[in-house]
A protein has these predicted regions:
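Short, small-residue-biased leader/transition segments that mark boundaries at the very start
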Residues: 2-4
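Terminal helices and disordered tails flanking the catalytic cores of nucleotide-processing hydrolases
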Residues: 6-149
Length: 149
């Protein structure tokens, strides 16, 4: 089961290395109680029983701090951004909005002391960062050995 192994493996690694409790709290809250969207959708599209979907939901806890919310959002956006075929400003903006709005709709942020203003600011910062990260660069040509200096 992908969902439970992600959390249990993360906690086991944290225990093995003696990481503090606060790190373990981040591990169990970074997916909250969300579904594994890809696997759940694939299961349902393949004719899976909509009443038998518990294994497609993480058994973590909802984030309770702003920092845990930031990790949850950044983790989800980073993973989803890898699937983009076009890193245009519009596509990046739509992706970030869809993911953050989905977390709000799924009630994942309700236990955290975070304002709408904080959420909107986070969205803008993430969009800006992704645009910088994925902007294309000009390919610099190598100078030919016989080229004039």
């Amino acid at each position: 089961d992908v969902c439970s192994s992600d959390l249990s493996d993360g906690l086991a690694i944290a225990e093995k290395h003696g990481l503090p409790g606060i790190i373990k709290e981040f591990i169990v809250s970074h997916h909250g109680t969300t579904s594994t969207g890809y696997f759940l959708t694939q299961y349902l599209n393949d004719g899976g029983d909509p009443e038998d979907v518990a294994e497609f939901y993480y058994d973590g806890v909802k984030p309770v701090t702003k920092e845990q919310v930031v990790l949850m959002i950044c983790d989800a956006v980073e993973a989803a951004s890898r699937s983009l075929k076009d890193y245009s400003q519009q596509n990046i903006s739509s992706l970030v909005d869809r993911i953050v709005d989905g977390k709000v709709r799924e009630d994942q942020l309700s236990d955290a002391d975070i304002s709408i203003r904080d959420i909107n600011r986070m969205k803008e910062v993430i969009k800006s960062y992704l645009m910088q990260m994925y902007h294309s660069r000009v390919s610099y040509p190598k100078r030919k050995e016989n080229a004039k200096k």
